[in-house]
A protein has these predicted regions:
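Positively charged n-region of N-terminal signal peptides that target proteins for export
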Residues: 1-4
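Hydrophobic membrane-insertion alpha-helices, especially the h-region
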Residues: 6-20
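Terminal hydrophobic membrane-targeting helix
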Residues: 18-89, 95-103, 114-123
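Flexible, membrane-facing loop/turn or short amphipathic-helix motifs
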Residues: 61-79, 94-109, 126-146, 158-164
Length: 164
């Protein structure tokens, strides 16, 4: 019986070590980054995602990727997994939305960019940002309570819907 508990303890420690190794080490981060890249690229042929950097630690996240060598996604900041707190900045620039049609399942045209912050915890979170959707000057603020939207404010100026 004692051998069983020792074996079980060793197995649990091994599993925890493996999860830690995959999620929070440089080697594990490169594995996860490659997995994300391959998953997106294998499921379709029109868009090529290249993960330039994926770093996840117990306290931070950094995700930097390019799409078709001319569009970028960057997410960086504090991500406290066990405390369920987030304070990240994001910056997304898509040079041509029509190239993403097979992913979005919508016919869209023109460039798109958005940047802002996502800050909060499991009980209350806030997303604030700016965008140029439809060549507009857009600002937005979303408040989430228990990950459910409770307040959404959008201010869109000079939108040119025909360009979308």
């Amino acid at each position: 019986m004692q051998k069983f508990f020792i074996s079980l303890t060793i197995l649990i420690i091994f599993i925890i070590g493996a999860v830690y190794g995959v999620l929070f080490t440089k080697i594990g981060n490169s594995f996860v980054g490659s997995y994300i890249e391959n998953k997106v690229n294998d499921e379709q042929n029109d868009v090529k995602l290249k993960v330039n950097d994926f770093t996840l630690t117990f306290n931070t996240i950094n995700f930097d990727a390019s799409i078709n060598d001319n569009s970028n996604i960057n997410i960086a900041g504090d991500l406290k997994i066990f405390q369920k707190k987030v304070d990240v900045k994001y910056d997304i620039k898509i040079n041509e939305l029509s190239k993403l049609e097979n992913l979005t399942k919508q016919k869209l045209n023109g460039p798109f960019s958005t940047s802002g912050i996502f800050k909060g915890d499991a009980n209350f979170s806030e997303i604030k940002g700016i965008s140029d959707i439809a060549q507009s000057e857009t600002s937005y603020e979303l408040k989430l309570i228990d990950f459910e939207p409770k307040n959404i404010d959008f201010l869109v100026k000079n939108a040119r819907i025909e360009k979308l």
